[in-house]
Amino acid sequence: MPIRRSPITAAIALSLLAFSALAADLAPEALLKKAEAEQKPYLATVEQLVNVDTGTGQEPGLKAVSALLVERLKALGAEVETSPASPSAGDNIVGTFKGTGSKSFLLMVHYDTVFLPGTAAKRPFKVEGERAYGPGVADAKGGVAMILHSLKLLQDDKFDGFGTLTVLFNPDEETGSAGSKKIIAELARQHDYVFSYEPPDK
């Protein structure tokens, strides 16, 4: 995952602008500056997530990361609900924020990976030059962290220009989302805009 200032800060800023475009008092330049300051804590969150094995079906790691995500969402002020992603291991996590606007947004990404148990211990998160490495660093724990830190910056700015802002973290995307596709479809139908934080193929 590239960690040059511009890709990370631009991604966070664009994530913020998706919502802040609804509010005239949030200037893009100011958001970019805040996003630049958020790079270090963002990478710390990525490291925390990457260093736990969450291969699809690996219940201990999925449970640990699920607890962390629930804690982080609640700290940001979300109303949080979890439900088993049966027949998959792990929980679907839904965090909901209520605002003063009219439009609804869904932010979604998975927190499982394709890696075997023990991979995180063998090659933990590291930064070399302008790249970060580790199991799931791009697909998609970087996206999980992107959502959390975008929400933090919105909260810091006291921005509530949305009607409903919903976050969905699912634990089984890498094997087809058997235990989460239903809730994904249901939530998508309920929102005006849906943002997936899955990385592009290239």
Residue ranges of predicted features:
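Bacterial N-terminal signal peptides that target proteins for export
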Residues: 2-11
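Basic side chains
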Residues: 4-5, 135, 141, 152
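Enrichment for repetitive, rod-forming helical segments
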Residues: 11-12, 41, 117, 142, ...
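N-terminal signal peptide c-region/cleavage motif recognized by signal peptidases
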Residues: 18-20
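Acidic/His- and Gly-rich active-site-bordering loop/insert found
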Residues: 25-135, 155-162
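Acidic/histidine-rich catalytic neighborhood of metal-dependent amide-processing enzymes
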Residues: 140-202
